[in-house]
């Protein structure tokens, strides 16, 4: 058979299996590099949006800093009690990929969510980390009293901190380990410690119950005093690097220690036929905890 005949067969076969002879999946943008040598990479192994940030000298396959962008989007309609999920990340290569675009030092994509909400997500590599921005456009007359996208940075390798020995928050009197009020976490069997969530209030009232064991099988630990800034940071094992997350305003900050994730997820209202924006900054700094904190303080009010 001629090459043209084989090509015709491939094209006809693709009409029946939903593919095309040449891949119809959008191209993955190239890695973006900043002046400090950090690289921002769109993860090609997952169809749904995942980013990786590579420290200087790390290979492009490194997953020490992986960000699900976002892990989910949820909202609560006006005058309703229940929160509804508008999007949920699912790992793996199956499914449609977003059409990523590179715009200078940023990667951008658009996604249609449930509830007639359109999301434009932008991740910009800055000199000291990544700024994540979510723009919501409501195409219906239904108002949401609140909507939020959960940015999910997951830290492994030298940043992995399953017993919260290097993960800090900031109170009015200075830094404190997120898990400081649970000293038993350092010695209890991991099967007793995990699964867990450790939370600390910022604007929300501090829960009266310090430890909650809920029906989902997860133990929730609530710190007894609020933080004075929506900031959470994890040091690398050698104390050379800091990964920290900061937002302008949130209800609380928290972590799942098994994943060493950092959550500072703003919630905003979204009017019918309206627009809303949220942002967070993930700082990645070669330096001290104080260095990362000073940058967070300086940049916090620039966030949406």
Task: Go through the PLM ranges and name each one.
Residues 165-219:
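Low-complexity, serine/threonine/proline-enriched polar segments
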Residues 25-36, 54, 101, 112, ...:
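Beta-strand-rich recognition/accessory modules
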Residues 115, 138-140, 157, 282-286:
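Beta-strand elements of well-folded, non-transmembrane domains
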Residues 15, 20-26:
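Boundary at the C-terminal end of the N-terminal hydrophobic targeting segment
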Residues 75-127, 143-147, 158:
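Extended, loop-rich substrate-binding clefts of extracytoplasmic carbohydrate-active enzymes
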Residues 6-17:
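Bacterial N-terminal signal peptides
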